[in-house]
């Protein structure tokens, strides 16, 4: 469970960082489009880091279930973490789309 907590917190941190960078991009947009695009790219990288952490967490749960049997509780926790991430990520993605 400590790994689930650790990786969940790391994923939230990545989303918060992505939000910070996309906000910086929005502010820089009017004064320096090139810098704004750089901040958008950094925000995308932060979300990619979150995706990698989610993959690691999912593999951890799968390994746990291989050793201990299928666990509804573990799947519920994984789904809950994914739901939280999705809810937090949605406004970041919406802001990113304004740069497309």
Task: Outline where the language-model segments fall.
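Non-heme di-metal
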Residues: 1-100
